[in-house]
Amino acid sequence: MAFPPELTKDGYEIQFGTNHVGHALLLKFLLPLVVETATKLSSASEVRVVILSSIAHKFTVSSGIDFDTVKNKAERLSTFDRYGQSKFANAAYARELAKRYPQITIASVNPGAVKTGLQKTKAGGVLFRLYQAMFIPIIGVSPQEGARNQVWAATSKEAVSGEYYTPVGVAGNASAFAKSAEFGRKLWDWTEKELEGHRL
């Protein structure tokens, strides 16, 4: 989170490459087994994919994702815009994935402010560092508490495929742009093109 400008070894902006592209590639490799398992079970809700997003998905560039910045260091964007667009990709991709794989329950979740040390960074301005030092210790929850939303999405019969959940199991809080069918297709197409040629 809030990482300085850097690239993955595959040439993606570090946060986007780590939070979206890497996860999409792992999922590409796992999907055949996940789909096969879903077809063998009596209920699609028994097979789940939970994608970890963040409230930061709402704090991104005005276009949701600036695709011109995801294959370079994106130094013209703030570290929080870069993080936000990676988390935005998580929420939008989960929604699109759910449309394409209705036999699986797929949800994106915001774990909330969790005291993991993820926020301990030298990047960002004075206000963010003040937020880290003063508010996370007060409003943040333990990692065990922070895992509740993910566990809920992975197990609850009430989880709706394609939905974004805030703690715990609260739907309807995704940004309007993350719900855009047009943007979901655009992100899907971009991601599929990027993953071409990757094989196990």
What kind of feature is each model-predicted range?
Residues 94, 151-155, 192:
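C-lobe helix-loop cap of protein kinase catalytic domains
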Residues 33, 37, 156-157, 197:
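Generic structural signal for alpha-helix termini and adjacent loop/cap motifs
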Residues 86, 108, 133-175, 181-185:
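C-terminal helical subdomain
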Residues 1-120:
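Rossmann-fold NAD(P)H-dependent dehydrogenase/reductase core
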